[in-house]
Amino acid sequence: MNDAALLASPLFRGATSEEIAAMLPCLGASPRRFARGERILRAGEPTRYMGLVLTGSVLVEHTDLQGAVTLLGRAEPGDLFAEAYACASDELLLVDVVASEACEVLFLDARRILTQCTSTCEHHSRIIRNLVRTLAQKNLALSRRSLHTGPRTIRARLLSYLGEQAQRAGSRSFTIPFDRQQLADYLNVERSALSNELSKMQRDGLLTCRRSSFWSTSMQAPKHTRPIPNRN
């Protein structure tokens, strides 16, 4: 099993390799390998298990009634997926989780995580705290995305998102965690329209950009002195 991925996971924050190994049986841990393109979790079905990526990567996708697929997220070693659905247990998944390459996933039983073991060990309590923190962080990330995709125009969406990134960096010069296609998907716009608007914004003197690096001339320098950790 990939100890590095387990140690990097927010679920096991603060735990040693030995402590994690001792906790896994209590959490109903079950590893499984998937081939590229194989469906890990299917929309329309419930799950009591959350997944932790050990090797490779997985995609979280939504398919509409016409068959159009929208990429909602990507999970890499150490990342969790489907934890909110697993904790709700009776909620049907609205998304598919698909292996983007050969991967190994560790499934964890949400009911066994949320129910204290008979020894009421400190390690189990830490896992619950870490899970709540992870759920809160992902909820805030969804709230930020809703804020950035709320404006009607592409320019307004870009200014909203890039303004936040400048604030997080504590500088007018910053690098975003997306390439151009990923940024278009995140803001829910067409890539060509996004590229055209960025070109217009550069001509208007609002910013300069190269790939994922930006320098804003339109926003005031952030007043805080400590950069905000980027959770996107």
Residue spans for each PLM region:
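Phosphate-/nucleic-acid-contacting segments
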Residues: I154-R157, Y161-N232
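Short, small/polar residue-rich loop motifs at catalytic or cofactor-binding pockets
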Residues: C26-L27, E45-T47
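Cyclic nucleotide-binding regulatory module and flanking cytosolic helices
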Residues: M1-R36, Y85-A88
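Cyclic-nucleotide recognition modules
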Residues: L71-R129
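Glycine- and acidic-residue-biased ligand/ion/polar-headgroup-sensing regions
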Residues: G37, R48-E61, E76-G78
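Short, Lys/Arg-enriched, Trp-marked, Pro/Gly-tolerant hinge/linker segments that flank
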Residues: E122, L142-I154, Q167-S173
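Short phosphate-coordinating micro-motif centered on Lys-Gly-acidic
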Residues: R39-E45
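Long, hydrophobic or amphipathic alpha-helical segments
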Residues: S125-I128, V132-L142
